[in-house]
Amino acid sequence: MSIEQSQLLAGKKGIIFGLANKKSIAWGIAQALKAQGASLAFTYLNEALEKRVRPLAEELGAELILECDVQNDQHIEKVFNQVEEAWGGLDFVVHSVAFADGADLKDRFHKTSRDGFKLALDILSLIHI
């Protein structure tokens, strides 16, 4: 049996933060997880991004598509509560969210502002389970 046919993640449920488009790392991860039988949930930041995320999530048969600003603790808590209510639990999280202030991208990395670095770090690493 090939790995493509093995369904290693059948019955497993996971949520993906950070899907933006078909060039996203999150898209490739989501496709691989779905191919292995996982049930998927996705998040989006706001209504504007929902218009891009929802069609992609639906293409992969997403069971949950939820709004979540990862800088907002109440949003994070609400998302995990919604997942708990719908699925009774969660097997994995994919955190593929990244952000940097445009002003900090205009110069060399070592010239990133302290506030810009804190913002990027906050967004990159704040999902806790």
Report residues per predicted region.
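Canonical Rossmann dinucleotide-binding motif of NAD(H)/NADP(H)-dependent dehydrogenases/reductases
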Residues: 6-42
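Conserved glycine-rich Rossmann-like NAD(P)H-binding loop of the short-chain dehydrogenase/reductase
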Residues: 36-54
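Conserved small/polar residues in nucleotide/adenosyl-binding loops
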Residues: 127-129
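Conserved hydrophobic beta-strands of the Rossmann-like cofactor-binding core
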Residues: 13-15, 93-98
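Local beta-strand N-terminus motif with an aromatic residue
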Residues: 62, 89-90, 117
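Glycine/Thr-rich phosphate-binding loops of Rossmann-like dinucleotide-binding domains
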Residues: 24-25, 50, 101-104
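Conserved mid-core segment of classical short-chain dehydrogenase/reductases
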Residues: 57, 68, 72-77, 81-86, ...
